[in-house]
Amino acid sequence: MLFRQVEFSFINVPPSYLVPAGTWQIVLAFAFLLVVAISEEVIFRGYLILRFRTLAGNRTAALLLSSAIFSIGHGYQQSGGVIAVGILGLVFGLVYLWRGSLLAPMVMHFLQNFIGIVLFPLGMQ
C-alpha cells in the first residue's frame, strides 16, 4: 500500500515554466547553476566531510553522512531523485577525497545540473 503512494522516478523533467526561454534566460540559468554547484560542493564536500571526518575519525563514515544529508536536502525530487542525488553525492565525495580538491566535483556538479535542467529539457521541446 505504501509503495503505491510513493512516486518513483529517476527522470524528473522540470516543469515547462522552469525551462529557460531565450538566450538571456539561459545565461541567467548558467550563472545560477554555477553558484548552486559551487556552494553545494563547499558545504557538503568541503565543510561536512571535513567536520564529520574529525568527529567520526573515519573518512568513509564522513562521506556517507555527507552524501545522506545532501540526498535528503533534495527530497523535493521524489524517491528516485533522492536516490540518484545520493549516488551523485557519493561520486562527488569520492572524487573530492581522491583529488583533494573541490574543483573537479564543482565542475561535475555544474555539468550535471546544466545538462539536466537546461540542455535536456530544451532538447525535448
Q: Where are the regions a protein language model picked out?
A:
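Short active-site segment of divalent metal-dependent hydrolases/proteases
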Residues: 40-44, 77, 112
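Membrane-interface helix/loop boundary segments of multi-pass membrane proteins
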Residues: 39-65, 94-101
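Juxtamembrane helix-loop-helix connectors linking adjacent transmembrane helices
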Residues: 1-36, 54, 125
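Aromatic-anchored segments of alpha-helical transmembrane domains
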Residues: 1, 67-75, 111-118
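Residue-level hotspots within pore-lining transmembrane alpha-helices
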Residues: 35-40, 83, 87
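Functionally important transmembrane alpha-helices
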Residues: 64, 81-125
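Short, motif-level signal for alpha-helix interfacial/capping segments enriched in acidic residues
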Residues: 14-23, 53, 78-94
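Residue-level signature of transmembrane alpha-helical entry/exit and packing/kink sites
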Residues: 25-29, 59-63, 81, 85
